[in-house]
């Protein structure tokens, strides 16, 4: 059967060579599952994060801010959101700002974490599963401490999930590792070095993730300005001790002769940091002139570039942009290095600190000296208890027991102590607990070792026990000062019993400790996460209550102002009505006074006119003339009386004068 033919391997497993089959199986599994890689982009709005991601993957993955929703290839979801005012939102759909709203632009956006899954298949048919974490709202608040806290909590939570899964007795085979392997920090292109927010963010998050600084929109600088900006950033990183990813950390592990190219590449990348990238989502077709034997031919080429009035800037041109180099680092040459450093250094450091805090001990559990000391203390206490429990009539045995009790067990006298106490070890082995003198805590025997000793063919002549630091073998044959009258069978049985006893003494505490950790750590981590969430919810509730109280007070204040305004308007209306009534009454009084004066004036004029007429008649005017003129006078008098009924006093006086003039004219004619 061929070694690559895996049929019927379950029936005849010895035929398959494991050295040749394992790599193929692992490669097939890895090719099917794919390589998982997670990176995070952090930076203020407008530094080019979204355009960088879309350019990195050569497709539309994320939508820009204030851009109309367009179809994307990635599946984006919101992991968490925290408002600047710690007010709970009804849903996360209001986070998407597709249109600019000037009324709400002054509000603090808070911080949100979004996750996008992308699957890439390269030319070798290798699958790459990318997980992209974006941080919209970073750096846009008055107090950006909120952003640092939320990102740090998310990174720690991913470490806690892995730690809880590792310490479980029964692990989940479908567990997904969501740790972030690298963080791309986009520096605002000011040209003056790092700002305070940049230094604080990178120093605070460097404990949980690899950080690579990136300068976005590098085409906004000239070559000299860009080199000066990079130098200022390097000076600030060194001055403020900002830990970033170093490409030359592992140069000592390489051979200068065999790995010369790799060493030079790492040095080049170290001197190139921070990466200055030019990105674009626009695609152009250009003609690339090539010289051949037949003549000059223009070959079309598709590029991603930025268009300016004077020409195009190719984002993959290393003369102006470090984008192709950074892309090769992330998705190629240093992908596995970033993952290994995350797991082997960052996670292990966090794991050690976390377990130390969870268990309450001030020392790590992998300290060999502490384990060895605990083992010897346990052996000494167990032997002292067994010696104190021995009773008999033999004085020599009592003396030996007393001497053994006062003797500290070591590797030299361990065989003698074992032989002297072999008669009573079985009774003490069956106890359910072993007391340690160093901790004074009653520990149960290991559940991984059977309490009933069973003979083994390998332990007939030699009894051995194994600890975490040493292995001791005790010969069960000839012993100096031993008693040969007990026989070979009893010696072999006692040695087997002693062997199991020392196994429990050495392995039992470690197994119990590991079991305690595996049972405790996941629940402690989960309990802490629940407490953190509960505290966060309480803070949000308190903030919401304060916000509602402020809004209620503001509404009450506005209502009081409206009531006062309404009352003032009513008072003004009443005053206006009173003024109108007073003005109307005064006009009526004036009209009545005028009408009364006019009536009194008309009566006086009538009396004077009748007096004048009587005087004229008395003066001897002719009857005919008097009669004729009397008719006209009666007409005028009737007209006068008609006019006298009107209230206009001036008009009546004018008519009276005209009547007198007519009388004078009549007299003059005669």
UniProtKB/Swiss-Prot annotation:
Residues 216-219 are annotated as: G4 motif. Transmembrane segments: none annotated. Residues 383-513, 574-670 are annotated as: Disordered. InterPro entries: G_SEPTIN_dom, P-loop_NTPase, Septin, Sigma_54_int_dom_ATP-bd_1. It is found in: Bud neck. One of its GO terms (biological process) is cytoskeleton-dependent cytokinesis. The keyword Hydrolase applies. Residues 134-137 are annotated as: G3 motif. Residues 43-50 are annotated as: G1 motif. Residues 472-606 form a coiled coil. It comes from the Eukaryota. Keywords: Cell cycle, Cell division, Coiled coil, GTP-binding, Hydrolase, Nucleotide-binding, Phosphoprotein. One of its GO terms (molecular function) is molecular adaptor activity. Phosphorylated by GIN4 which stabilizes the GIN4-SEP7 interaction. GTP binds at residues 43-50, 137, 217-225, 306. Residues 33-357 form the Septin-type G domain. Residues 476-487, 631-645 have a biased composition (Basic and acidic residues). Disulfide bonds: none annotated. Its main location: other. Residues 405-421 have a biased composition (Polar residues). GO terms for cellular component: cell division site; cell septum; cellular bud neck; cytosol; Gin4 complex; microtubule cytoskeleton; septin complex; septin ring. Septins are GTPases involved in cytokinesis that assemble early in the cell cycle as a patch at the incipient bud site and form a ring before bud emergence, which transforms into an hour-glass shaped collar of cortical filaments that spans both sides of the mother-bud neck. This collar persists until just before cytokinesis, when it splits into two rings that occupy opposite sides of the neck. The septins at the bud neck serve as a structural scaffold that recruits different components involved in diverse processes at specific stages during the cell cycle. Component of the septin complex which consists of CDC3, CDC10, CDC11, CDC12 and probably SEP7. The purified septin complex appeared to have a stoichiometry of 2 CDC3, 1 to 2 CDC10, 1 CDC11, 2 CDC12, and 1 or none SEP7 subunit. Induction of hyphal growth brings about important modifications in septin ring dynamics, because the rings were found in a different state from those of yeast cells. This hyphal-specific state contains a core of stable septins (SEP7, CDC3, and CDC12), and it shows a high CDC10 turnover between the ring and the cytoplasm. Interacts with GIN4. This is Septation protein 7. The lineage of its organism: Eukaryota, Fungi, Dikarya, Ascomycota, Saccharomycotina. The gene is SEP7.
């Amino acid at each position: 059967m061929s070694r690559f033919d895996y049929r019927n391997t379950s029936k005849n497993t010895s035929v398959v060579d494991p050295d040749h089959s394992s790599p193929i199986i692992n490669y097939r599994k890895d090719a099917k599952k794919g390589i998982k890689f997670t990176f995070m982009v952090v930076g203020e709005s407008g530094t080019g994060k979204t355009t960088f991601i879309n350019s990195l993957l050569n497709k539309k993955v994320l939508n820009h801010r204030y851009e109309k929703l367009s179809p994307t290839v990635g599946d984006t979801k919101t992991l968490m959101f925290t408002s600047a005012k710690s007010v709970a939102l009804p849903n996360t759909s209001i986070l998407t700002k597709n249109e600019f709203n000037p009324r709400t632009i002054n509000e603090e956006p808070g911080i949100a974490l979004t996750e996008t899954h992308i699957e890439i298949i390269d030319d070798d048919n290798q699958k790459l599963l990318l997980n992209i974490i974006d941080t919209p709202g970073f750096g846009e608040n008055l107090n950006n401490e909120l952003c640092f806290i939320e990102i740090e909590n998310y990174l720690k939570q991913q470490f806690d999930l892995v730690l809880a899964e590792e310490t479980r007795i029964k692990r989940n085979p479908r567990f997904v590792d969501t740790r972030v392997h690298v963080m791309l920090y986009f520096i605002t292109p000011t040209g003056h070095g790092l700002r305070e927010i940049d230094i604080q963010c990178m120093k605070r998050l460097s404990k949980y993730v690899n950080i690579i600084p990136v300068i976005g929109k590098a085409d906004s600088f000239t070559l000299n300005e860009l080199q000066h900006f990079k130098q200022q950033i390097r000076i600030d990183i060194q001055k403020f001790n900002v830990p970033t990813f170093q490409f030359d950390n592992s140069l000592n592990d390489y051979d200068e002769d065999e790995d010369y190219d790799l060493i030079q590449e790492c040095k080049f990348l170290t001197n190139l940091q921070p990466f200055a990238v030019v990105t674009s989502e626009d695609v152009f077709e250009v003609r690339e002139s090539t010289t051949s034997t037949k003549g000059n031919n223009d070959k079309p080429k598709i590029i991603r570039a930025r268009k300016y009035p004077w020409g195009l800037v190719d984002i993959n041109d290393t003369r102006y942009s470090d984008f192709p180099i950074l892309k090769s680092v992330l998705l190629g040459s240093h992908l596995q290095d970033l993952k290994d450093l995350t797991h082997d250094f960052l996670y292990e450091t966090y794991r050690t600190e976390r377990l130390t805090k969870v268990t309450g001990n001030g020392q790590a559990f992998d300290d060999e000296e502490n384990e060895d000391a605990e083992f010897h203390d346990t052996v000494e206490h167990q032997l002292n208890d067994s010696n104190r429990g021995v009773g008999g009539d033999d004085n020599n045995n009592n003396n030996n027991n007393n001497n053994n009790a006062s003797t500290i067990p070591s590797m030299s006298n361990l065989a003698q102590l074992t032989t002297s106490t072999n008669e009573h070890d079985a009774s003490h082995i069956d106890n359910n607990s072993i007391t340690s003198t160093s901790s004074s805590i009653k520990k149960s025997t290991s559940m991984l070792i059977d309490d009933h000793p069973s003979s083994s063919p390998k332990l007939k002549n030699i009894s051995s026990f194994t600890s975490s630091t040493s292995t001791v073998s005790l010969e069960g044959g000839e012993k100096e000062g031993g008693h040969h009258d007990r026989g070979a069978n009893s010696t072999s049985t006692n040695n087997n019993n002693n062997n199991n006893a020392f196994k429990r003494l050495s392995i039992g505490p470690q197994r119990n400790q590991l079991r305690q950790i595996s049972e405790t750590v996941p629940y402690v981590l989960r309990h802490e996460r629940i407490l953190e969430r509960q505290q966060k919810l309480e803070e949000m509730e308190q903030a919401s209550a304060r916000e509602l109280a402020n809004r209620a007070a503001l509404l009450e204040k506005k209502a009081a102002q409206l009531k006062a305004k309404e009352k003032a308007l009513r008072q003004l209306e009443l005053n206006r009505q009173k003024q109108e009534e007073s003005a109307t009454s005064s006009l009526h009084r004036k009209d009545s006074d005028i009408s009364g004066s006019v009536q009194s004036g008309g009566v006086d004029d009538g009396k004077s006119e009748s007096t004048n007429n009587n005087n004229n008649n008395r003066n001897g005017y002719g009857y005919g003339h008097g009669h004729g003129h009397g008719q006209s006078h009666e007409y005028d008098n009737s007209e006068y009386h008609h006019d006298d009924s009107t209230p206009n006093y001036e008009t009546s006086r004018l008519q009276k004068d005209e009547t007198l003039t007519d009388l004078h004219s009549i007299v003059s004619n005669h």
